[in-house]
Amino acid sequence: MSRFNQKSARPMAQPKTRVTGPAVNHEGGPGFTNSSLGELYNLSVVNFVGQDTFYEKGDARDARYNGLVESVSTGDWPWLSGLLPWLRSEANIRTASLTGAAHAVHARLAAGQYEGNDTLIDSVIQRADEVAEFLSYWRITFGKSLPQAVRRGLGMAIRRLYTPRAALKWDSSARGLRMADVIELIHPKPLDAAQEALFRYLLDERHHGDGNPELVRLVAARKAWYAASDQDKLAALANGSAFKSAGLTWENASSELKARVGEKALWEAMAPHLPYMAAIRNLRNMDEAGISYAASAKLAARIADPQEVENSRQLPYRFLMAYLQAPSDRWKQALEEAINFSLKSVPELPGRTLVLVDTSASMHSQGFSAHSKATPAMAAALFGGILAQRNPGRVELYGFADGVFKHDVKRGEGVLSTVKKFTGRIGEVGHGTQMTQSIRRVYNGQDRLFVISDMQCFSDGTGRMLSNGEGFYGGGPQPIPVADSVKVYGVNIGGYSKTAVDTRVKNRFEFSGLTDQVFGQVLALEAGFDEKWPWMQ
């Protein structure tokens, strides 16, 4: 989805230590102030640009993110130049990596720091439409003047990404900047004769509407498909040639044929050839269209195929969202298998593990974004359910708010079923965030502790949080001491500036977001390795 390249767009008016000292969080409870690197990392991996969260408006959150990027870009460039490419490629977070690169480069140029700016821009752009997205954001935010570093970085991305298939997928009169506009603004040198012909076609089509399709074979095949009969179009979809030879997308095909051939015939023809993400996002549409058992069985087998899952690079919560959108039995098992394959790095942990999932109001009152049904509480339950399934009988899973509830996970129960049952209990023990009291109630000597939360906990009257200056909380009497040898893992899915985990002290760690890389970091720490930023591992 285009965020900035729209016709209506207008200019806008790990080192181990990640915290620096005590602070008060959004709930008035005790917490810790993140270091600038820790705060930026925590925020970046959970950031949906422009989206409100429970405690923070979208514009304030964006301003905090942009300010952190600008500060770190001039003060710790090697760190930031590792974070942003990792954010786009491994964490698969698109918009925050693009806007972050723009603010980083702008700040560095203003400070007279010129090295590596073009390379950073190129590294965060991984789809052809993102060139115009970045360019539009730059012009909206910083004005129409384009420094040479920006031109070079975008030129590198254009040569790498502007292909006939990309042009058919992403170039549209609905966008504020067409591909031809970008070419005219950046003046990239074509990679070869074929790309030079593509540039010429795009420019002619943009300005005169008479681009010669014979210059670009894929464009000619697309025009031929549109000129064919409905039955021939459907046949080309069914055998895959419309997608391979004509560069068609499911959106193109649906817009052209749905009203005339019917949704059932259309989805049955397209289903075997849909890109993986498009397939899992359209399961509900296929259910509503009433596709046959045979067609759905073939697609389900593909969804559950380990190689397809690995190639798709989908984050675990994508499968959860697919299940929430289309909870029918014909997809459930395939999605369960897919999510298991997507989490190969989930560790088998020796001994006993305590997992506490925050079910307070801030965790379930709204989705991750304006378009998402998945709430932070669902994602947290997903994390806990995965750990419990991978370690049967050795993980004790609890929800907590004002009180706690224990959630037993049956051996062999699917992760998605676990999440559904767990989140069905939200509200059972209130809607507050009594983190320290909850830990006191249920910690009884387990070998490690996970707390999955937005880390905005209520005050317990002691001013003590997830530290361990003397045992667990740090200072004063310890009703339930946790030895220094016990690792406490905080999984922060809020990204706020204040947190509950004091990572300055031994065996207290904080991760951000819910990618499977968190599990890889846990494995490394359990094996005795030092904590590192994920792109440095």
Regions found by a protein language model. Give the residues of each.
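Metal-dependent nuclease catalytic cores in nucleic-acid-processing enzymes
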Residues: M378-R394
